[in-house]
Swiss-Prot record:
Bias-annotated ranges (Basic residues): 36-46
Note on domains (UniProt): The RNA-binding motif binds to the RRE, a 240 bp stem-and-loop structure present in incompletely spliced viral pre-mRNAs. This region also contains the NLS which mediates nuclear localization via KPNB1 binding and, when the N-terminal sequence is present, nucleolar targeting. These overlapping functions prevent Rev bound to RRE from undesirable return to the nucleus. When Rev binds the RRE, the NLS becomes masked while the NES remains accessible. The leucine-rich NES mediates binding to human XPO1.
Role of this protein: Escorts unspliced or incompletely spliced viral pre-mRNAs (late transcripts) out of the nucleus of infected cells. These pre-mRNAs carry a recognition sequence called Rev responsive element (RRE) located in the env gene, that is not present in fully spliced viral mRNAs (early transcripts). This function is essential since most viral proteins are translated from unspliced or partially spliced pre-mRNAs which cannot exit the nucleus by the pathway used by fully processed cellular mRNAs. Rev itself is translated from a fully spliced mRNA that readily exits the nucleus.
Main location class: host cell
InterPro entries named among the record's database cross-references: REV_protein
Record organism: Human immunodeficiency virus type 1 group M subtype D (isolate ELI)
UniProt-recorded name of the protein: Protein Rev
Biased composition (Polar residues): 103-112
Other noteworthy facts: HIV-1 lineages are divided in three main groups, M (for Major), O (for Outlier), and N (for New, or Non-M, Non-O). The vast majority of strains found worldwide belong to the group M. Group O seems to be endemic to and largely confined to Cameroon and neighboring countries in West Central Africa, where these viruses represent a small minority of HIV-1 strains. The group N is represented by a limited number of isolates from Cameroonian persons. The group M is further subdivided in 9 clades or subtypes (A to D, F to H, J and K).
Superkingdom, natural source: Viruses
A Pfam family matched in the record: REV
Post-translational modification as stated in the protein's UniProt record: Asymmetrically arginine dimethylated at one site by host PRMT6. Methylation impairs the RNA-binding activity and export of viral RNA from the nucleus to the cytoplasm.
Amino acid sequence: MAGRSGDSDEDLLKAVRLIKFLYQSNPPPSPEGTRQARRNRRRRWRARQRQIREIAERILGTYLGRPAEPVPLQLPPLERLNLNCSEDCRTSGTQGVGHPQISVESPTVLESGTEEQC
C-alpha cells in the first residue's frame, strides 16, 4: 500500500478483517428440510447478507471518507427521451452499430391519443 502511513495501513487491515469476520459469521443455509423451510432459510440468509453488505459499505465509507457509490447522474424524464439514429447506424460489416444520438424532444408516435387543449 504505497503512499500510506503505517497506522493507516493497520486501520485498513482492521476494517478488512472485521468485514471478513462479518461475512464468515453468516454461512450459507443448509440444504436439509422441506422446500418451504429451505426457501425461508435462503430468504433470511439473503437478508442477513444484504445487511452485512450495507455495514461493510459503511465501514469502508467511514474509513475512506467518501461514499462507495458515485453520485447518480441526473437524466431528463423518460417520456422525453427517444433514439434518433443517423445514417451511419445502418452500415453493415465490422464497423459496429454506429453512434445513436439521444433526442430530448417528445416523438409524436409515443404520444397518447388524446389531444391537449390550450
